[in-house]
Swiss-Prot record:
Signal peptide: none
Gene3D superfamilies: Diaminopimelate Epimerase, Chain A, domain 1
Native source organism of the sequence: Marinobacter nauticus (strain ATCC 700491 / DSM 11845 / VT8) (Marinobacter aquaeolei)
Official protein name in the record: Protein Maqu_2141
Family assignment from sequence similarity: Belongs to the proline racemase family.
Lineage: Bacteria, Pseudomonadati, Pseudomonadota, Gammaproteobacteria, Pseudomonadales
Protein backbone atom coordinates (compact mmCIF):
# COMPACT_ATOMS: atom_id res chain seq x y z
CA UNK A 1 0.00 0.00 0.00
CA UNK A 2 1.37 3.41 -0.96
CA UNK A 3 1.96 5.83 1.92
CA UNK A 4 -0.50 8.71 1.97
CA UNK A 5 1.18 11.94 0.94
CA UNK A 6 -0.19 15.01 2.67
CA UNK A 7 0.65 18.69 2.86
CA UNK A 8 -0.19 20.65 5.99
CA UNK A 9 -1.60 24.14 5.51
CA UNK A 10 -2.60 27.10 7.63
CA UNK A 11 -4.74 29.34 5.44
CA UNK A 12 -4.69 33.02 6.36
CA UNK A 13 -5.76 36.26 4.77
CA UNK A 14 -4.70 39.89 4.99
CA UNK A 15 -7.04 42.42 3.47
CA UNK A 16 -8.90 39.59 1.73
CA UNK A 17 -5.88 38.08 -0.04
CA UNK A 18 -5.53 34.44 1.01
CA UNK A 19 -2.02 33.23 1.79
CA UNK A 20 -1.69 29.47 2.19
CA UNK A 21 1.11 28.82 4.68
CA UNK A 22 2.70 25.40 4.07
CA UNK A 23 3.73 24.14 7.50
CA UNK A 24 4.57 20.51 6.68
CA UNK A 25 4.70 17.75 4.14
CA UNK A 26 7.58 19.11 2.05
CA UNK A 27 11.13 17.80 2.31
CA UNK A 28 14.06 20.07 3.05
CA UNK A 29 15.11 21.88 -0.11
CA UNK A 30 18.65 22.19 -1.45
CA UNK A 31 20.26 25.61 -1.19
CA UNK A 32 22.42 27.52 1.26
CA UNK A 33 20.06 30.50 1.39
CA UNK A 34 16.32 30.98 1.22
CA UNK A 35 16.88 32.73 -2.11
CA UNK A 36 18.69 29.63 -3.46
CA UNK A 37 15.88 27.39 -2.19
CA UNK A 38 13.36 29.62 -3.95
CA UNK A 39 15.34 29.28 -7.17
CA UNK A 40 15.33 25.49 -6.77
CA UNK A 41 11.54 25.49 -6.42
CA UNK A 42 11.18 27.78 -9.42
CA UNK A 43 13.48 25.76 -11.67
CA UNK A 44 13.00 22.17 -10.48
CA UNK A 45 9.86 21.89 -8.34
CA UNK A 46 7.27 24.36 -9.64
CA UNK A 47 4.62 21.68 -9.17
CA UNK A 48 4.00 22.79 -5.57
CA UNK A 49 2.99 26.29 -6.65
CA UNK A 50 0.77 24.94 -9.41
CA UNK A 51 -0.84 22.36 -7.11
CA UNK A 52 -1.92 24.89 -4.50
CA UNK A 53 -2.95 27.68 -6.89
CA UNK A 54 -4.92 25.62 -9.40
CA UNK A 55 -8.03 23.45 -9.22
CA UNK A 56 -8.95 21.21 -7.52
CA UNK A 57 -6.89 22.51 -4.56
CA UNK A 58 -6.82 26.26 -5.08
CA UNK A 59 -7.38 29.26 -7.34
CA UNK A 60 -4.94 31.75 -8.92
CA UNK A 61 -6.09 34.59 -6.65
CA UNK A 62 -4.43 32.88 -3.67
CA UNK A 63 -0.75 32.98 -2.68
CA UNK A 64 1.42 30.29 -1.11
CA UNK A 65 4.15 30.71 1.50
CA UNK A 66 6.34 27.69 2.19
CA UNK A 67 7.94 27.74 5.64
CA UNK A 68 11.55 26.59 5.53
CA UNK A 69 14.34 26.59 8.11
CA UNK A 70 16.09 29.94 8.24
CA UNK A 71 19.64 29.93 6.94
CA UNK A 72 20.49 33.06 8.96
CA UNK A 73 20.60 32.32 12.72
CA UNK A 74 19.00 35.68 13.50
CA UNK A 75 15.73 34.66 11.82
CA UNK A 76 12.99 32.56 13.43
CA UNK A 77 12.00 30.97 10.11
CA UNK A 78 12.37 31.35 6.39
CA UNK A 79 9.59 31.54 3.81
CA UNK A 80 9.27 31.28 0.04
CA UNK A 81 6.48 33.19 -1.70
CA UNK A 82 4.56 31.73 -4.63
CA UNK A 83 1.95 33.53 -6.72
CA UNK A 84 0.24 33.15 -10.09
CA UNK A 85 3.03 35.23 -11.67
CA UNK A 86 5.77 33.04 -10.19
CA UNK A 87 8.14 33.66 -7.30
CA UNK A 88 8.34 37.25 -6.05
CA UNK A 89 11.29 37.78 -3.74
CA UNK A 90 9.12 39.81 -1.37
CA UNK A 91 5.50 40.59 -0.56
CA UNK A 92 4.11 42.71 2.26
CA UNK A 93 0.78 40.88 2.60
CA UNK A 94 2.47 37.47 2.45
CA UNK A 95 4.98 38.57 5.08
CA UNK A 96 2.20 39.78 7.38
CA UNK A 97 0.39 36.44 6.94
CA UNK A 98 3.56 34.39 7.46
CA UNK A 99 4.47 36.35 10.60
CA UNK A 100 1.00 35.72 11.99
CA UNK A 101 1.26 32.02 11.14
CA UNK A 102 4.58 31.52 12.92
CA UNK A 103 3.07 33.16 16.00
CA UNK A 104 -0.11 31.09 15.85
CA UNK A 105 1.90 27.89 15.28
CA UNK A 106 4.12 28.62 18.28
CA UNK A 107 7.30 28.79 16.19
CA UNK A 108 7.69 32.21 17.79
CA UNK A 109 5.92 32.19 21.19
CA UNK A 110 3.38 34.98 21.57
CA UNK A 111 4.09 37.75 24.04
CA UNK A 112 1.50 40.27 25.18
CA UNK A 113 2.05 43.75 23.83
CA UNK A 114 4.71 44.50 21.24
CA UNK A 115 7.22 41.85 20.25
CA UNK A 116 9.94 41.78 17.65
CA UNK A 117 11.53 39.01 15.61
CA UNK A 118 13.00 38.39 12.19
CA UNK A 119 11.99 36.26 9.22
CA UNK A 120 14.16 35.36 6.25
CA UNK A 121 12.61 36.01 2.84
CA UNK A 122 14.24 35.39 -0.53
CA UNK A 123 15.06 39.12 -0.46
CA UNK A 124 16.86 38.79 2.90
CA UNK A 125 16.10 39.41 6.56
CA UNK A 126 12.83 41.14 7.46
CA UNK A 127 12.20 42.86 10.79
CA UNK A 128 8.76 42.11 12.23
CA UNK A 129 6.83 43.93 14.94
CA UNK A 130 3.68 42.19 16.18
CA UNK A 131 1.09 43.54 18.58
CA UNK A 132 -0.63 40.84 20.63
CA UNK A 133 -3.64 41.55 22.85
CA UNK A 134 -5.32 38.82 24.91
CA UNK A 135 -3.48 36.22 22.85
CA UNK A 136 -4.70 37.64 19.52
CA UNK A 137 -2.30 39.00 16.90
CA UNK A 138 -3.91 42.38 16.32
CA UNK A 139 -1.39 43.91 13.92
CA UNK A 140 1.87 43.13 12.18
CA UNK A 141 4.32 45.70 10.88
CA UNK A 142 7.00 44.54 8.48
CA UNK A 143 9.70 46.30 6.54
CA UNK A 144 8.87 47.07 2.96
CA UNK A 145 11.68 46.56 0.49
CA UNK A 146 13.62 49.71 -0.40
CA UNK A 147 11.51 51.22 -3.18
CA UNK A 148 12.28 53.66 -5.97
CA UNK A 149 10.93 55.15 -9.18
CA UNK A 150 12.58 53.62 -12.22
CA UNK A 151 10.56 55.44 -14.90
CA UNK A 152 8.49 58.57 -14.38
CA UNK A 153 5.52 59.74 -16.43
CA UNK A 154 6.02 57.61 -19.52
CA UNK A 155 3.31 56.89 -22.08
CA UNK A 156 2.32 53.89 -24.17
CA UNK A 157 -0.35 53.18 -26.76
CA UNK A 158 -2.47 50.25 -25.62
CA UNK A 159 -4.66 48.46 -28.20
CA UNK A 160 -8.34 48.98 -27.43
CA UNK A 161 -7.62 51.66 -24.83
CA UNK A 162 -5.41 54.33 -26.38
CA UNK A 163 -2.57 56.34 -24.89
CA UNK A 164 -1.90 55.50 -21.22
CA UNK A 165 0.41 57.48 -18.93
CA UNK A 166 2.33 55.44 -16.37
CA UNK A 167 5.30 55.43 -14.02
CA UNK A 168 7.28 52.37 -12.97
CA UNK A 169 8.35 51.68 -9.39
CA UNK A 170 10.33 48.82 -7.89
CA UNK A 171 9.15 47.69 -4.44
CA UNK A 172 9.86 43.95 -4.49
CA UNK A 173 8.80 43.66 -8.11
CA UNK A 174 8.33 46.20 -10.88
CA UNK A 175 4.97 48.01 -10.81
CA UNK A 176 3.29 50.10 -13.46
CA UNK A 177 1.53 52.92 -11.61
CA UNK A 178 -1.47 54.39 -13.41
CA UNK A 179 -4.06 56.99 -12.48
CA UNK A 180 -7.45 55.29 -12.15
CA UNK A 181 -9.53 58.42 -12.85
CA UNK A 182 -7.78 59.02 -16.17
CA UNK A 183 -9.03 55.60 -17.30
CA UNK A 184 -12.57 56.20 -16.01
CA UNK A 185 -12.38 54.11 -12.83
CA UNK A 186 -13.65 54.98 -9.33
CA UNK A 187 -12.10 51.79 -7.87
CA UNK A 188 -15.32 50.17 -6.69
CA UNK A 189 -15.99 46.45 -6.50
CA UNK A 190 -18.33 46.40 -9.50
CA UNK A 191 -15.38 47.50 -11.68
CA UNK A 192 -13.21 44.50 -10.75
CA UNK A 193 -13.57 42.57 -14.01
CA UNK A 194 -13.00 45.63 -16.19
CA UNK A 195 -10.00 46.64 -14.07
CA UNK A 196 -8.47 43.20 -14.70
CA UNK A 197 -9.12 43.45 -18.44
CA UNK A 198 -7.64 46.93 -18.65
CA UNK A 199 -4.59 46.09 -16.54
CA UNK A 200 -3.95 42.95 -18.59
CA UNK A 201 -3.86 45.01 -21.79
CA UNK A 202 -1.56 47.66 -20.30
CA UNK A 203 0.89 45.14 -18.83
CA UNK A 204 0.99 43.18 -22.09
CA UNK A 205 1.77 46.38 -23.98
CA UNK A 206 4.52 47.44 -21.58
CA UNK A 207 6.07 43.96 -21.55
CA UNK A 208 6.15 43.93 -25.34
CA UNK A 209 7.71 47.39 -25.52
CA UNK A 210 10.45 47.29 -22.90
CA UNK A 211 12.13 45.56 -19.99
CA UNK A 212 13.34 46.82 -16.63
CA UNK A 213 16.53 46.20 -14.70
CA UNK A 214 17.08 46.68 -10.95
CA UNK A 215 20.14 48.75 -10.04
CA UNK A 216 21.67 45.90 -8.01
CA UNK A 217 19.62 42.79 -8.87
CA UNK A 218 19.81 43.26 -12.63
CA UNK A 219 17.18 41.55 -14.78
CA UNK A 220 14.31 40.34 -12.58
CA UNK A 221 12.01 39.32 -15.42
CA UNK A 222 9.13 41.07 -17.20
CA UNK A 223 7.00 43.62 -15.36
CA UNK A 224 4.39 41.58 -13.42
CA UNK A 225 2.33 44.16 -11.49
CA UNK A 226 0.11 47.17 -12.07
CA UNK A 227 -1.31 49.46 -9.41
CA UNK A 228 -4.37 51.64 -10.04
CA UNK A 229 -4.12 54.84 -8.00
CA UNK A 230 -7.14 56.73 -6.76
CA UNK A 231 -7.04 60.36 -5.57
CA UNK A 232 -5.11 60.96 -2.35
CA UNK A 233 -7.05 62.51 0.53
CA UNK A 234 -5.15 64.26 3.31
CA UNK A 235 -6.87 62.94 6.43
CA UNK A 236 -4.56 64.62 8.96
CA UNK A 237 -1.10 66.14 9.06
CA UNK A 238 1.23 63.53 7.61
CA UNK A 239 -1.57 61.01 6.99
CA UNK A 240 -3.03 60.29 3.55
CA UNK A 241 -5.66 57.87 2.27
CA UNK A 242 -6.26 56.60 -1.26
CA UNK A 243 -8.41 54.00 -2.92
CA UNK A 244 -6.19 51.56 -4.80
CA UNK A 245 -6.20 48.28 -6.70
CA UNK A 246 -3.29 45.98 -7.52
CA UNK A 247 -3.19 43.68 -10.53
CA UNK A 248 -0.97 40.58 -10.79
CA UNK A 249 -0.29 39.33 -14.31
CA UNK A 250 -1.96 37.34 -15.72
CA UNK A 251 -5.53 38.11 -14.79
CA UNK A 252 -5.69 38.68 -11.02
CA UNK A 253 -7.00 41.75 -9.20
CA UNK A 254 -5.85 41.37 -5.60
CA UNK A 255 -8.42 41.49 -2.83
CA UNK A 256 -6.10 43.76 -0.83
CA UNK A 257 -4.13 46.79 -1.95
CA UNK A 258 -0.92 44.76 -1.32
CA UNK A 259 2.07 45.79 0.72
CA UNK A 260 4.39 46.17 -2.26
CA UNK A 261 1.77 48.25 -4.06
CA UNK A 262 1.61 50.56 -1.05
CA UNK A 263 5.42 50.79 -0.96
CA UNK A 264 5.42 51.69 -4.65
CA UNK A 265 2.97 54.53 -3.95
CA UNK A 266 5.25 55.89 -1.21
CA UNK A 267 8.16 55.89 -3.66
CA UNK A 268 6.10 57.89 -6.17
CA UNK A 269 4.90 60.39 -3.55
CA UNK A 270 8.50 60.94 -2.46
CA UNK A 271 9.66 61.33 -6.07
CA UNK A 272 7.03 64.03 -6.60
CA UNK A 273 7.99 65.78 -3.34
CA UNK A 274 4.61 65.23 -1.70
CA UNK A 275 5.64 63.24 1.37
CA UNK A 276 8.18 63.47 4.20
CA UNK A 277 9.80 60.90 6.49
CA UNK A 278 7.27 59.87 9.12
CA UNK A 279 4.27 60.43 6.83
CA UNK A 280 1.80 57.59 6.28
CA UNK A 281 -0.38 56.44 3.39
CA UNK A 282 -3.41 54.22 3.95
CA UNK A 283 -4.37 52.36 0.79
CA UNK A 284 -8.00 51.18 0.58
CA UNK A 285 -9.04 48.25 -1.61
CA UNK A 286 -12.14 47.54 -3.69
CA UNK A 287 -13.42 45.66 -0.62
CA UNK A 288 -12.61 48.54 1.75
CA UNK A 289 -9.72 46.70 3.39
CA UNK A 290 -6.31 48.26 3.57
CA UNK A 291 -2.71 48.59 4.65
CA UNK A 292 -0.84 51.50 6.16
CA UNK A 293 2.53 52.35 4.68
CA UNK A 294 4.97 54.60 6.53
CA UNK A 295 7.79 56.46 4.78
CA UNK A 296 10.76 56.16 7.14
CA UNK A 297 13.86 57.46 5.33
CA UNK A 298 15.22 58.10 1.85
CA UNK A 299 18.70 57.33 0.53
CA UNK A 300 20.40 57.98 -2.78
CA UNK A 301 21.62 54.93 -4.69
CA UNK A 302 23.26 56.00 -7.94
CA UNK A 303 20.57 57.79 -9.95
CA UNK A 304 17.71 56.74 -7.67
CA UNK A 305 16.02 58.06 -4.53
CA UNK A 306 15.37 54.87 -2.56
CA UNK A 307 12.56 54.99 0.00
CA UNK A 308 12.78 52.91 3.16
CA UNK A 309 9.31 52.09 4.45
CA UNK A 310 7.18 49.83 6.60
CA UNK A 311 3.79 48.22 6.06
CA UNK A 312 1.19 47.53 8.76
CA UNK A 313 -1.80 45.22 8.46
CA UNK A 314 -3.73 42.45 10.15
CA UNK A 315 -3.96 38.79 9.17
CA UNK A 316 -6.63 36.29 10.13
CA UNK A 317 -6.33 32.50 10.30
CA UNK A 318 -9.20 30.97 8.32
CA UNK A 319 -8.34 27.26 8.11
CA UNK A 320 -6.06 24.45 9.22
CA UNK A 321 -6.00 21.56 6.78
CA UNK A 322 -4.19 18.47 5.58
CA UNK A 323 -4.56 18.05 1.84
CA UNK A 324 -4.07 14.61 0.34
CA UNK A 325 -1.91 14.49 -2.79
CA UNK A 326 -2.81 11.50 -4.96
CA UNK A 327 -0.64 11.42 -8.06
CA UNK A 328 -2.96 8.81 -9.61
CA UNK A 329 -5.76 11.41 -9.67
CA UNK A 330 -6.10 12.66 -13.27
CA UNK A 331 -6.82 16.15 -11.91
CA UNK A 332 -3.46 16.24 -10.10
CA UNK A 333 -0.22 16.92 -11.97
CA UNK A 334 2.70 15.66 -9.88
CA UNK A 335 5.35 16.72 -12.38
CA UNK A 336 7.79 18.95 -10.54
CA UNK A 337 6.23 17.97 -7.22
CA UNK A 338 6.54 14.30 -6.28
CA UNK A 339 10.26 14.45 -5.48
CA UNK A 340 9.79 17.09 -2.74
CA UNK A 341 6.73 15.55 -1.08
CA UNK A 342 7.31 14.00 2.31
CA UNK A 343 5.23 11.44 4.19
CA UNK A 344 6.69 12.69 7.48
CA UNK A 345 4.65 14.30 10.19
CA UNK A 346 4.66 18.11 9.98
CA UNK A 347 7.82 19.67 11.37
CA UNK A 348 8.45 23.20 12.48
CA UNK A 349 11.20 25.15 10.79
CA UNK A 350 14.35 25.21 12.89
CA UNK A 351 14.78 28.30 15.03
Amino acid sequence: MKPELTIQLMDTHAGGDVSRIVTGGIDLLPGDTVRAQMEYLRDDADGLRKLLLEEPYGIPEMSVDLLVPATDPRAAAGYIIMEVMGYPIYSGSNTICTATAVLEAGIVPKQEGKQHFMLESPAGLVNIEAIVHDGVVEAVTCEGLPSYIHTYNASINVPGIGEVAYSVAYSGGFYALVDAKSLGFDLTLDEERELARTAHAIVEAIQAARGFSHYTLGDVGPLPFLHFMGPEEKVADGYYRSRSATYVHPGVICRSTTGTGTSARLALMNYEGRIQPGDKLETVSLRDTGFIGEFTTVETEGDYQVVKNSITGKSYVIAHSDIVVNCDDPMVDCDGLHHILSSRHPQRPAT
